[in-house]
Amino acid sequence: MKPRVLYVTHRVPWPPDRGDRIRTWNILKFLAQRADVDLVCLADEPVSAKTRKALEGVTRRLAFVPHAGPRRYVRGALSMACGRTATEGLFESRQLRSIVKLWSSNAEYTAALASSSGIARFVQPPYVKTAGRVWIDLIDVDSQKWLDYQSSSRFPMSTVYGLEGRRLRNLESKLASDVDRM
């Protein structure tokens, strides 16, 4: 019996036409050659039939969670106001949580993998109940990106970017100690 992997991505990995999509697509192909992969992705644009077909060809189970519009920015601001990162709020999704919980209750995963720090919580308890290993692929270190924005911006955005960068750095450090691979 093949291992079973849950892969949660912050964007649809097809078509592989830019950095993060190229990376997540290559990881997905690699995993699919070795395991049965259940893929759930946030979709910030409509998913075409061609995209669906390409991803169905390499997954056991597939779900797209619509994730566009101004409400995500409100969630990001509220998250930041509550002491978390804006990134975590931007990627918050009740539907994503529900799918992960449902799939996890019906399958025993050998591993669970998330494609960014902003969605890392979705591959850890209490959302995933049965993952042997938890992996997080930061793709790029978002905390450094925000700290770089801080140094090239003026007040008040420099303050916001700096706060996000520091909070994300703390989150990334915590994840490094909480998960099996990063």
Task: Kindly label every feature range from the protein language model.
Residues 1-64, 105-107:
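N-terminal subdomain of nucleotide-sugar transferases
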Residues 100-120, 132-135:
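Short N-terminal targeting/anchoring amphipathic segment
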Residues 10, 69-90, 134-173:
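Acceptor-binding helix/loop patch of EC 2.4 sugar-transfer enzymes
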Residues 129-133, 179-180:
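A short helix->loop->beta-strand "cap" motif at the edges of active sites that frequently abuts
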Residues 116, 138-140, 182:
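Helix N-cap/beta->alpha junction signal
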Residues 47-49, 117-123:
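Short, well-ordered alpha-helical microsegments
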Residues 112-113, 172, 177-182:
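A short beta-strand/loop micro-motif in the catalytic core of glycosyltransferases
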Residues 41-106:
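A conserved catalytic-core segment of Leloir-type glycosyltransferases
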